[in-house]
Amino acid sequence: MSKTDKIPSHVAIIMDGNGRWARARGLERHEGHRAGVNSLRNVIARAARNPGVRYLTLYVFSTENWGRPQEEVDMLMELLCRSIVNELDELLREQVKVVVIGERAGMSKTVVEHIELIERETAACTELTILLCINYSSRGELTRAARRLAEKAVSGELSPAEITPETIAGELYTGGIPDPDL
């Protein structure tokens, strides 16, 4: 296999453009989001069956998405919960572990319960790990990591000189997971 044929071990996908896709076809935005879920089902199935792909990161809902119209946010959260319920058996069958990264503060109790359900039920799965970024921002993640390192420095657990790219990486949601290849 040549270097250009190397299968990535960690693929990341920004789920964007569903509303534009729907508008271009004369459909409602929510129909675009539902079509996006259907496309994602195929991506997950292919990744789960590819022994080279170990991690699939899906940027599902950023912190900026809270600025969308409330009706759309509610629909997206309902679609997320429904997708968790509808896809759980298939994820278990395919041995797909799901980990949600992002801040749970601000999410409804129902959404958090669904997130906890899918994480708990798939925790022992070993073929593929999906990282769902929900209520996520990279700035928020870096702020969280910096705060945790500062707390360790103040408590004497760590000296400022010991803060390295590796210690920062260890405080990220994705600590211990390779960076995305794509």
Language-model segment annotations:
Residues M1-L182:
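Flexible, compositionally biased loop and terminal segments
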